[in-house]
Structure formats: C-alpha cells, structure tokens
C-alpha cells in the first residue's frame, strides 16, 4: 500500500543569499570538461553555474560554482550557513543575539531540516520546539480569505521572559483524517493508496490578548496548516527574467487549458494586475534611487513576494525570530487595532499583544530587569519608567519599547550579507540515474500525460541584474552571486493554480512548487 499525505501549504520560509566579493569576480565561468558533455542537458538541474554533484544526505546544502570560485564569497557562505543552522538566543550581546520578545521559531533549520521541506506535525498539539517540524499555522477569516488581525501572519507561539506568547500552541490541536477520492483510493491495476488531510482547531483561550480582555471576540476564523518547502536554488529562480515570467502567464492565459484560469488578482488580459514593491519607510534605504520599482510576484505558495532580496527568506530572518537589523528596526506585531484611533493606535501601535503585555501585572513585574539588559545606558529614555511602582508609567514604557521603530540593531549588516550570500548561493543537486531506462521512461511519461504543462521542466535565466526592493543591495550587486544565461530545470511554471484539496490552501490558489 502506498501512502500519500495532502498537506495544506501556503507560505514559506524560503531563504535568500547574499555575499561580498570584488566587482570583477561575481561571475564564474566553468572550464570545459569532456565528462560534462556526456550527460544530457537535464542532468544539470541548476545549469553549469548552479548544479552540485554530491549525492549524500548533504546534497541540498552545497554552494554554487560562483561561491566556490570566490574566496570571500566562500567564507561568507560558511558564515551564512551558521546563521541559518544555529539557534538564536534571548541574550542581548554576543553571536545570534536578540531572539524575541515574541517569536515563531528560534532558528531557520527548525522548519527546513537538510535545507528541504519539513516533516509534518503528528496528531495532537501543535508544537514547534523540535527541529524538523515544517508546519506553520494559517489563521484566517474565511469570509475574506485574509489573515486574522489578532495574530501575526506567521503566528508567534513563543516569547522571552517576562513576556508571554501571543498564542498558546498547546491549545491548537491537529487531527489527521482519512479521505476517499472519486476513484475509491485505487489505481486501475487494483493497487490502493491512502489520502490524509489535517483538521486543525484553535481554542479561543489559546489567544493571550483575548485572555487578558483586550479582545472581546475573535470573530469568524479558520485554521490551516502550511508546509515549508526547500530553499536550495532560489537564486536561480530569481535569475529568470521578468519578461520570460510574463510570457509564461500570457501563454497559459491564451491556452485556456485550466478550468479555473489564472488568478486574476495577479494577471489578466495579458497584463499584470499587480506586482511587488516595498515602499515602507521603515524598510527602504532613504538614499535608494530605484525605490518603488515593481517586479512580478514569484516566491511563496501564495505569491506574496517578488525579488529574492526581499522575499520570504530575507524577511523570515527577521520575522521568525524577531531579530532586528538595519532595515528592520521594529518588532513583528499583530495589527488588531490598525484601524483604531486613540491610545490603541498611538500608544499600543495598533497591536493587541502590545496592549495585553503592557498591562499584564506579571509582565510589568519583570520588565525593569529585562529592559535594563536591553538598554543598560538608557539611550532610549521612553523605554524606562521613572517610577516602577506606577503601573501606568510601566505600561507606557513597555508599549514604547515594543512599538519602537528605532530598536537597536541585533543582526549587523555583515551578518545579513553573509546570510544572503549563503541563501542566494545554494546549488541544486544534479539529476540522478539519468542513464537508467526506467528514469528515462518516467521522464517521457511525465511529459506525455501533461504534467510538464504546470511543472515546466526548464527555463533559461536572463542577465540576472537582480533588484533589492529595500535598497540594501544595488542592482546586480557584486557582493552576491549571479547566474546569467543558465538553462535550469526547476519543473515549475511559477504560476498559481487551484488544487481543490480538502481543507484547501488559503485563497485556493497555490504556486507550482519548484
């Protein structure tokens, strides 16, 4: 019997990679190798510059050739790898500092073991402390398909003392249910298979702000699971030109093969309906001359991100851990009071968790010792109370700290560059057993039965003068590896389609996973 699991997927921690190198060494052209010419083109899944040839369990962790050919990039890649693999700590000095005050996971590898997708959360309470659980919660309003405002988009189930987690994960329960399809879960030859899907319940008292009386009602909400995906080769996907991506959308729209067509929120009548840009003054370099450029959405299941330099991985390094950096000097918070007026907006920054934390007697009792470690020299006077017996003063100080947009930098620029060099520098393992008749036959069948339409086998990258919406990196920045004019084999059209799963993905639209 074969077992298949239907995972409800959506976001992604997809990570990004950047590096520092000299201006004339950011491209690498491999020398001709007679042995290379004996393999079919599809053997080189990442092209000549982005393919790795290791076949062990570490195959997804290898650097691309531009990384290996550049000593400085190679060292940055190794440093970035450590930032991905090691846990962040709640101390306020030293390496990998600054975890919290509320956070989703303490490391990237918690969700991406072996740099691939995570394993599923077993039945029972949702838990994120073990490395390997690649499930994230999607808590949304089914009336609007939008995320609920009383939690962050990626719900935070942990907090550093004296703060309390916005969500009590022990009160989020997962049940895996059996599903029978229209064919009775049997292949034509009689072989059977299992289909399963998760049913997730979240008790109202799992939400800290509601327990503290800040939220009176959670309203209509539903909970899904989303699975992380692999992060290798994302630099190669970023190197596909915007024009080629648009041509793929236009072709599929014109073909009209899909019963549900294309997601018209992104593309309609041959043109983009919307594209990605980042115009937040908190994020974008004020001296960035190319700010506000628009580029197609191409990353995450939900197509929530555009260029890799501001995509899921670069963002996750901040919002999963709540570790600040020079272009993210604020905390990742819920937006429950975003449309409110008065103190809910001006004092508590629109966040229900901030309001609950600021007025929680237990949080207030531990706040003085906490903030004196964070800001021992009192460089931020509003974060401190003059009289810690005055509950109103303490509440204001807590709120000022949690909502500040001038937090001290916890990940310095050099570490962030290292992380991005690593992320953009991850190679794709070469195809295996390319001479095996069964593999060759399988590839032919894959194309014959139509899988290759959505799972487009290959693309050719453009010039790869990549763009960073934050303005941290310049266009085609020499500190990062580039992959121009490479034939790559991601087996994805990078377009969203409807999968019609039980307890379907939020919005029902899911990008074809590379």
Residue ranges with predicted function:
Residues 17-45:
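Bacterial Sec-dependent N-terminal signal peptides
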Residues 89-99, 122, 430-437, 441, ...:
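Surface-exposed patches in mature extracellular/periplasmic domains of secreted proteins
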Residues 55, 62-76, 85-415:
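Extracytoplasmic redox metalloprotein regions
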């Amino acid at each position: 019997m074969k077992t298949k699991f239907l995972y409800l997927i959506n976001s992604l921690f997809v990570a990004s990679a950047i590096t520092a190198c000299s201006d004339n060494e950011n491209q690498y052209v491999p020398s001709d190798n007679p042995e290379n010419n004996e393999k079919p083109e599809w053997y080189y899944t990442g092209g000549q510059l982005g393919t790795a040839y290791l076949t062990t369990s570490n195959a997804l962790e290898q650097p691309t050739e531009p990384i290996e050919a550049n000593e400085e990039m190679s060292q940055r890649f190794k440093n970035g790898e450590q930032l991905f693999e090691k846990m962040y700590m709640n101390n306020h000095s030293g390496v990998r500092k600054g975890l919290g005050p509320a956070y989703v996971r303490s490391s990237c590898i918690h969700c991406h073991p072996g740099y691939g997708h995570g394993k599923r959360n077993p039945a029972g309470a949702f838990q994120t402390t073990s490395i390997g659980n690649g499930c994230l919660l999607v808590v949304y309003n089914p009336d609007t398909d939008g995320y609920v405002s009383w939690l962050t988009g990626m719900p935070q189930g942990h907090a550093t003392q004296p703060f309390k987690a916005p969500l009590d994960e022990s009160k989020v329960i997962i049940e895996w249910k059996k599903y029978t399809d229209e064919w009775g879960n049997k292949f034509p030859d009689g072989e059977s298979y299992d289909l399963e899907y998760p049913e997730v319940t979240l008790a109202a008292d799992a939400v800290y702000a509601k327990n503290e009386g800040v939220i009176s009602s959670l309203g209509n909400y539903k909970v899904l699971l989303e699975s992380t995906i692999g992060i290798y080769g994302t630099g190669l996907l970023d190197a596909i030109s915007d024009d080629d991506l648009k041509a793929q959308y236009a072709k599929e729209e014109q073909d009209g093969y899909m019963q549900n067509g294309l997601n018209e929120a992104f593309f309609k009548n041959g043109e983009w309906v919307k594209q990605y840009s980042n115009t937040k003054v908190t994020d974008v370099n004020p001296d960035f001359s190319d700010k506000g450029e628009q580029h197609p959405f191409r990353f995450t299941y939900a197509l929530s991100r555009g260029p890799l330099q501001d995509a899921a991985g670069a963002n996750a390094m901040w919002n999963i851990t709540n570790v600040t950096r020079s272009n993210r000097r604020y905390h990742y918070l819920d937006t429950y009071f975003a449309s409110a007026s008065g103190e809910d907006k001006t004092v508590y920054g629109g966040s229900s968790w901030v309001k609950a934390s600021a007025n929680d007697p237990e949080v207030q009792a531990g706040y003085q010792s906490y903030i004196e470690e964070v800001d021992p020299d009192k460089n931020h006077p509003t974060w401190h109370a003059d009289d810690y017996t005055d509950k109103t003063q303490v509440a204001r100080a807590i709120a000022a700290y949690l909502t500040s947009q001038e937090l001290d930098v916890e990940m310095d620029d050099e570490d962030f560059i290292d992380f991005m060099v690593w992320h953009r520098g991850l190679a794709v393992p070469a195809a295996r057993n390319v001479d095996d008749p069964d593999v060759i036959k399988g590839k032919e069948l894959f194309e014959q039965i139509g899988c290759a339409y959505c799972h487009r086998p290959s693309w050719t990258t453009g010039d790869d003068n990549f763009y960073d919406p934050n303005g941290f990196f310049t266009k085609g920045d020499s500190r990062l590896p580039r992959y121009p004019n490479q034939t790559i084999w991601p087996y994805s059209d990078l377009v969203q389609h409807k999968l019609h799963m039980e307890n379907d993905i939020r919005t029902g639209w899911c990008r074809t996973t590379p």
